[in-house]
Amino acid sequence: MEEDCEFRHWDELIPDALGLIFSHLPLQEVLTVVPRVCKAWNRAVTGPYCWQEIDIELWSNRFHQSDHLDRMLEMLIPRSAGSLRKLSVTGLRNDSIFSFIAQHAGSLKTLKVPRSGLTNSGVVNVAEKLSSLTFLDLSYCCKIGPEAIQAIGKHCKSLREFCRNMHPLDVASVVSHDDEAYAIANTMPKLKRLEIAYHRVSTEGVLKILSCCVFLEFLELRGCWDVQLDNKFFKEKFPDMKVLGPRVIGFYDMINDWEDCCSDYFSDGSDYLAWEFFEDGVMGEFYEDEFEHGWDDNFYAENAVLDMEPHIWPPSP
């Protein structure tokens, strides 16, 4: 005797469920494979459920400072329909595309834009539109300084994590970053995590941050060679603080037996931790001649080396 069972077809899943599933697929497949399966999947891909979190950091590394990157963002971000919560991208070309992001940042909580060509004026002009941010990464953005940081701190009152790491070569000619340290201390009192690796910051600058950011739980000072903090004083004053950086030993336990596993990273006889697309149009319905305005698969073949293994969709139950 056959049991009566109800099966739900893949194309009948609710859009938010489809969006959650598709968000775990590689970007290329979401844009070139999924829309061709059926109309329901194509609608899900062009709707907001797939794009509440946009992580194209790896993809953007291939098109650093490129108009391809601008076009990708201009296509994907509006699909979120104002529900964008997280954006990870590297190498924004200029303030214009950053302003475009800010225009759609009403729900944005996490923003990662390292290695971008942003300027002080560009950040100042849009900082108030980023007020919902809790996490911001402006690492390796060499054209901004204390003015931009102060604007972020002034308008982003919910900011809890701030990354402002630099590359040693980018700061070789910089005399001091204390002005940035003071901007952070004076405008970001609720920070819980701060990364300022390889900043030319002084001991006074770091102490100013520590005295003002009383909720700080993690501080990265890797490569901040001018900072000298007394180990005993630090243990007594900030017993729960985790610090990664020179002249502060024993506050960062990433794994068990860290020193044994990574002894090569410690300088002998010192207190340092020494470590060093697409098409012009928007994807439309993939049916008959309507696909002539769709995604151009050759964009990937001509411009990047990507994993092109065939994707086999499971049959509908």
From Swiss-Prot:
Residues 7-54 form the F-box domain. Pathway: Protein modification; protein ubiquitination. Keywords: Nucleus, Ubl conjugation pathway. It comes from the Eukaryota. GO terms for cellular component: nucleus. Disulfide bonds: none annotated. GO terms for biological process: negative regulation of gene expression; post-transcriptional regulation of gene expression; protein ubiquitination; response to abscisic acid; ubiquitin-dependent protein catabolic process. Pfam families: F-box-like, LRR_6. Coiled coil: none annotated. It is found in: Nucleus. Signal peptide: none annotated. Component of SCF(ASK-cullin-F-box) E3 ubiquitin ligase complexes, which may mediate the ubiquitination and subsequent proteasomal degradation of target proteins. The F-box is necessary for the interaction with ASK proteins. Part of a SCF (SKP1-cullin-F-box) protein ligase complex. Interacts with CUL1, CUL2 and SPK1B/ASK2. This is F-box protein FBW2. It comes from Arabidopsis thaliana (Mouse-ear cress). The lineage of its organism: Eukaryota, Viridiplantae, Streptophyta, Embryophyta, Tracheophyta. The gene is FBW2.
